[in-house]
Regions:
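Hydrophobic faces of well-ordered beta-strands that scaffold small-molecule active sites
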Residues: 18-24, 43-45, 71-74, 94-96, ...
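Alpha-helix-loop-beta-strand connector modules within alpha/beta enzyme cores
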Residues: 54-88, 112-117, 135-137, 187-210, ...
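N-terminal amphipathic alpha-helix/helix-capping segment at the start of soluble metabolic enzymes
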Residues: 1-25, 129-138, 195-204
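Glycine-rich, proline-tolerant flexible connector loops at the mouths of alpha/beta enzymes
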Residues: 31-57, 172-187
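Short, acidic/polar
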Residues: 24-38, 77-86, 149-161, 214-220
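Conserved anion-binding
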Residues: 81, 91-179
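Glycine-rich, positively charged N-terminal anion/phosphate-binding segment
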Residues: 3-7, 27-34, 38, 51-65, ...
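C-terminal alpha-helical cap/extension of soluble enzyme domains
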Residues: 120-129, 146-150, 183-252
Length: 252
């Protein structure tokens, strides 16, 4: 892979660690623009829990290609067609939710790779990305989202999957799966122990280690644990916290 063919996300990960991101759940370009202006390194688009369809994601990716931020799309499973579509639309990487086995992780990787290494069909939608399949494949990152007890049990096998870019921890679902509460999940001993195990396994395998932190304080704690890619807030959270801060200032 050349410097010219590398994605913005790949370049960010080469420049520094950790990198920090924001999360977008609705079909608006305001969130990505404001995260970029604030100095965030990447933006994640949520096609699992968010209100974003294929057309929304394709449009937002095109409208934000001038921004100096990487782009990641979270998808609900390793179904090949949606993975191919968002990569064709120009996403730097996909985060595949609820990965619980090496076979599921391998299926996600195969969906992002062209034959003979995978089963992705060639159909680039973004002229700015060119028409070289090798470039398209080399810039497409694949992250396995680790968020269940089953995934924790098989973490070493998952991390050994060839072609996987990294793992991305979902603390809330992981906490639920382990029988713990969602609020303050990363501060609960059992969940924190699991997070540390996941980070170490992925790091030992040479993978990018990502996690959904949800706020700056938790993000700092996750950085101290060695995570290299940390999501700090969704656009709705950032708006709510900012609005609350302004109201406090005005009424104190």
């Amino acid at each position: 892979m050349t410097e010219n063919s590398a994605s913005v996300l790949q370049l960010a990960l080469r420049r520094k660690t950790p990198i920090f991101g924001g999360w977008v759940t609705g079909p608006t370009v305001l969130g990505p623009e404001e995260f970029a202006r604030a100095g965030y390194d990447y933006v994640g688009f949520d096609a699992q829990h968010g209100y974003l369809d294929d057309a929304d994601i394709a449009g937002i990716l095109r409208r934000t290609e001038h921004l100096p931020v990487g782009t990641v799309v979270r998808l609900p499973n390793a179904d090949a067609a949606p993975i191919g579509r968002v990569l064709d639309a120009g996403a730097d990487a996909v985060v595949i939710a609820m990965i619980e086995s090496a076979d599921q992780a391998a299926a996600a990787v195969a969906a992002a790779r062209y034959p003979p290494r995978g089963l992705r069909s060639f159909g680039p939608l973004r002229a700015s990305l060119g028409v070289d399949p090798a470039d398209h494949e080399s810039r497409a990152g694949v992250f396995a989202m680790i968020e269940t007890a089953a995934a924790l049990a098989g973490i070493h096998e998952i991390c050994a999957v060839n072609g996987l870019t990294g793992i991305y921890v979902g603390p809330a679902d992981l906490a639920i799966s382990l029988g713990s509460g969602v609020v303050g999940a990363t501060r609960q001993p059992e969940v924190l122990e699991a997070i540390v195990r996941i980070q170490r396994a992925a790091s030992d395998a040479g993978l990018v280690t990502g996690i959904h932190a949800g706020d700056g304080k938790t993000g700092q704690a996750m950085a101290q644990l060695g995570f290299g890619m940390i999501t700090l807030a969704a656009e709705s959270q950032a708006l709510r916290r900012g609005a609350a801060a302004h109201l406090r200032e005005a009424t104190q």
